[in-house]
């Protein structure tokens, strides 16, 4: 094949470009998602610059390095898409969209948590065994086992010291505590028979017998029944431990550092030497299993305890009462007995039985306390929403008032498998937050105002159709009112089912009256009801806020208030601290902001929604009344009389002019008729005399 033939068979380049152009054009128009509706507020996006793409690549690379994910093209693309979606979902800073309207909004129950502090009220903690541990019981926890142990990273702030349990600064340390009941015996060699319970509790930092200002001070002593001076006797049922709250003679200190001072007035029973009546030196040192370094070992391996001395053994700090810690510095808060129910469930409790015997050695009385254990009871403690437990390496920073925890777990229950190498932080859902939100229209209280405003924008420019359009608007408002009335009827129909509720309540009343004891299933339902009441209390507080606020009509999940967001007064860093839960001098002043918002809402509540717009329409209609024009000139009798005379004169003048015009019109009509008659007779007057023609014209 010669070169000329090859050149003739080769396709021309220009034709190839022509075939490729339609394909490129179609590729430019191809989309991978549904076509989105273009709104009036939609703006054309600028193409990304090289600097933006470079920055996005750097952020994606940094994210993959932090998460230890291999950098592949697929992972880089996913990381970039995640960063873009996160940036798009972030709140728009003030000034980014000058055409938008920014107002303060109250968001109830956002997906945020805060730490439970020592100033909060005690929470409900449920145990699965009411025989050995007092308090509400529930053996059907957790409610959602598949969600237990979900991983979470937290970084939240606090105002008052948070409640934390574990071996870490700012947390209450665990320890083993004993509770003992006594049974007197008549045996000559046995003085007493003991039944003792050992379990996990809260460790005191200072020995309660040492002289300490907080211990001997009655300033923080709670009101309650004093602990008995005698050891509680055994109850009728030997398998039940009877708990009775009491106040000891002195307090123990659980924590005293930069995080605050926490004390407990519950009794801390342990054996000590009774040196009363002894002539020789008698050591009054205490002997307590709580000094063991390994907590689990003290409860698992030590199944036999023996105490021997030449001096009689006595049990100090009588009383079967649970710890009730409270904070007294830097602030004074309520007692929190629920913390012990969480701690005691972290390991099984051990049941002891034994006695104290008396024998003679070297011609001296010799006392021996012998305790043996062969029974352990596993426990489980749970909390319910809106409360949760964050378990992990919790770090509390008092300088910045922040709490951080990486790779922590969210739990609602604690059992004997818990490892005290971790810490427990009590958290709860946030009741509500204040954030600025942007809108593409001004704030409006009701849809009627919105409808009326949109219609009046066109009405004011077309005054000829004003009355008809106003009637249409009023008919639209009536339709809205009718819809609300129909909804009220439907609600009334639902309320009529209260008869069924009454019948059900009567049946349940008979059930409660006829039932002698409550089984565990009903007890669980009661606990759920109690927790629901607590949750509903938070909901009612949120509803109270929303009732006090005048909100925009087009939002239902949260409330957009009429208070305009001022960036110079509340910059975004203050809002960010508020979202984190930090409350310091730089944080958003919520109380002051609430006062401003409530004042703005009160100003809008002075008028019924739509009254201002309807009043403007009424004023416009009133201006069309000519009577108002007369009233504006004057209201005296003389002026009114002059005006009446002027009106009569004008009326008379109009009548005279009308009569004159009518006469002129008659003359014109007669002349026209005469001219018409003459034109018809123009050819028929030739044979007549001149006299007859004159007569005809005169006629």
From Swiss-Prot:
Domain of life from the UniProt record: Eukaryota
Disordered, as annotated region: 1-47
Post-translational modification: Specific enzymatic cleavages in vivo yield the mature SU and TM proteins.
Note: Insertional polymorphism. Provirus present in 29% of tested individuals. Has a type 2 genome. The HERV-K(HML-2) family contains type 1 and type 2 genomes depending on the absence or presence of 292 nucleotides at the 5'-end of the env gene resulting in Env proteins of distinct sizes. Despite their overall retroviral envelope structure HERV-K(HML-2) type 1 envelope proteins lack a predictable signal sequence. Subgenomic RNA transcripts coding for full-length envelope proteins have been detected for both type of genomes.
Renumbered residue ranges of the record's region Fusion peptide: 466-486
InterPro entries the record matches: GP41-like (IPR000328), HERV-K_env (IPR029104), Retroviral_env_glycoprotein (IPR051255)
One cellular component (GO) term of this entry: plasma membrane
Job of this protein: Retroviral envelope proteins mediate receptor recognition and membrane fusion during early infection. Endogenous envelope proteins may have kept, lost or modified their original function during evolution. This endogenous envelope protein has lost its original fusogenic properties. SU mediates receptor recognition.
Residue numbers on the Cytoplasmic membrane side: 654-699
Family statement: Belongs to the beta type-B retroviral envelope protein family. HERV class-II K(HML-2) env subfamily.
Naturally occurring in which organism (per UniProt): Homo sapiens
CDD domains: HIV-1-like_HR1-HR2
Name of the protein: Endogenous retrovirus group K member 113 Env polyprotein
Transmembrane stretches, start-end: 633-653
Residues in the signal sequence: 1-89
């Amino acid at each position: 094949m010669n070169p000329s033939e090859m050149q003739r068979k080769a396709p021309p380049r220009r034709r190839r470009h022509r075939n490729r152009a339609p394909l490129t054009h179609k590729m430019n128009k191809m989309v991978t998602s549904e076509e989105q509706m273009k709104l009036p507020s939609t703006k054309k996006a600028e193409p990304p610059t090289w600097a933006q793409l470079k920055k996005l690549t750097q952020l994606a690379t940094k994210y993959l390095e932090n998460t230890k994910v291999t950098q592949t093209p697929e992972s880089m693309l996913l990381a970039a898409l995640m960063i873009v979606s996160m940036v798009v979902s972030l709140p728009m800073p003030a000034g980014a969209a000058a055409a938008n309207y920014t107002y303060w909004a109250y968001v109830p129950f956002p997906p945020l948590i805060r730490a439970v502090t020592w100033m909060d009220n005690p929470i409900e903690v449920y145990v699965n065994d009411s025989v050995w541990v007092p308090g509400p019981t529930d053996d059907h926890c957790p409610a959602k086992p598949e969600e237990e142990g979900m991983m979470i990273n937290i970084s939240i702030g606090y105002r008052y010291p948070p409640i934390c349990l574990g071996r870490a600064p700012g947390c209450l340390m665990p320890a083993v505590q004993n509770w003992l009941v006594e049974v007197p015996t008549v045996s000559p060699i046995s003085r007493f028979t003991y039944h003792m319970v050992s379990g996990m509790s809260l460790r005191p930092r200072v020995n309660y017998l040492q002289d300490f200002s907080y211990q001997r001070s009655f300033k923080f002593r709670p009101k309650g029944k004093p602990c008995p001076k005698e050891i509680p006797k055994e109850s009728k049922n030997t398998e039940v431990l009877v708990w009775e709250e009491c106040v000891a003679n002195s307090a123990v200190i659980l924590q005293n550092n930069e995080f605050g001072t926490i004390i407990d007035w519950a009794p801390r029973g342990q054996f000590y030497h009774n040196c009363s009546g002894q002539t020789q030196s008698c050591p009054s040192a205490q002997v307590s299993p709580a000094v063991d370094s390994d907590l689990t070992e003290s409860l698992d391996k030590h199944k036999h305890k023996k105490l021997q001395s030449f001096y009689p053994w006595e049990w100090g700090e009588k009383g079967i009462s649970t710890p009730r810690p409270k904070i007294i510095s830097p602030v004074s808060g309520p007692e929190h007995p629920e913390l012990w129910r969480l701690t005691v469930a972290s390991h099984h409790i051990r049941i002891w039985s034994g006695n104290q015997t008396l024998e003679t050695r070297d011609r001296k009385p010799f006392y021996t306390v012998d305790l043996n254990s062969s029974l352990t009871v596993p426990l489980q403690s749970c909390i319910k929403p809106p409360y949760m437990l964050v378990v992990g390496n919790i770090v509390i920073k008092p300088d910045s008032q922040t709490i951080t925890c990486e790779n922590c777990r969210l739990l609602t229950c604690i059992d004997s498998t818990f490892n005290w190498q971790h810490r427990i932080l009590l958290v709860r859902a946030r009741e509500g937050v204040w954030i600025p939100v942007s809108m593409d229209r001004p704030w409006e209280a009701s849809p009627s105002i919105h409808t009326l405003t949109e219609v009046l924008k066109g009405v004011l420019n077309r005054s000829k159709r004003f009355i008809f359009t106003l009637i249409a608007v009023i008919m639209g408002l009536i339709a809205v009112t009718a819809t609300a009335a129909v909804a009220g009827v439907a609600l009334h129909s639902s309320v009529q089912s209260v008869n069924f509720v009454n019948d059900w309540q009567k049946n349940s009343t008979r059930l409660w009256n006829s039932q002698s004891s409550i089984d565990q299933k009903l007890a669980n339902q009661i606990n759920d009801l109690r927790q629901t009441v607590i949750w509903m209390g938070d909901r009612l507080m949120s509803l109270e806020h929303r009732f006090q606020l005048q909100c925009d009509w087009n939002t239902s999940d949260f409330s957009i208030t009429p208070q305009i967001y001022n960036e110079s007064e509340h910059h975004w860093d203050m809002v960010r601290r508020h979202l984190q839960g930090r409350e310091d001098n730089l944080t958003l002043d919520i109380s002051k902001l609430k006062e401003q918002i409530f004042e703005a809402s009160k100003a809008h509540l002075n008028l019924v929604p739509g009254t201002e717009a309807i009043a403007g329409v009424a004023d416009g209609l009133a201006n069309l009344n000519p009577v108002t024009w007369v009233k504006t000139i004057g209201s005296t009798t003389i002026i009114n009389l002059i005006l009446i005379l002027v009106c009569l004169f004008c009326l008379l003048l109009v009548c005279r002019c009308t009569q004159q015009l009518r006469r002129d019109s008659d003359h014109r009509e007669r002349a026209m008729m005469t001219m018409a008659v003459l034109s018809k007779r123009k050819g028929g007057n030739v044979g007549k005399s001149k006299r007859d023609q004159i007569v005809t014209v005169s006629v």
